[in-house]
């Protein structure tokens, strides 16, 4: 098993970057916060072992570009670990997600109807494991994906 030797965090918001910097001070390894979005990651190609994404893929403006950048910076057989919410498989729920998506985008920049699992594989990742389930809460925002994918 490998140890974490360094963490890079991407955050375009200065306010949130400052909050993350405060939290990162107690980490047992160096944390470097980068003023960038996932669509243009300021790191060398094939320089990262693992990318962790938690509740962010719904709000990235250009998801395809972001997943392409994640693939670019990951080393061969690198891992994308994700915990995300997205489009529910139930037609009645997904219709509500589609209806409410403009409101969520306007209020929180969130796209609750993205097909996260399909987007990851369409970007060229190999799905290693994935679980899909409703978590507690309103069904139109509680369908979640947790898993890991590898670069191919």
What are these model-derived regions, one by one?
Residues 49-62:
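A short SAM/SAH-binding and catalytic strip from SAM-dependent methyltransferases
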Residues 1-40:
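Class I SAM-dependent methyltransferase SAM/SAH-binding core
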Residues 108-124:
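Short alpha-helix
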Residues 91-106:
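Short, glycine-/aromatic-enriched active-site segment of Class I SAM-dependent methyltransferases
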Residues 77-85:
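Conserved beta-strand signature within the Rossmann-like core of class I S-adenosyl-L-methionine
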Residues 64-76:
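A short glycine-rich, Lys/Arg-flanked "PGG" loop and its adjoining helix->strand segment in the class I
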Residues 39-51:
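A short acidic, Gly/Pro-enriched loop at the edge of an enzyme's catalytic core
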Residues 129-152:
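Core SAM-dependent methyltransferase catalytic element
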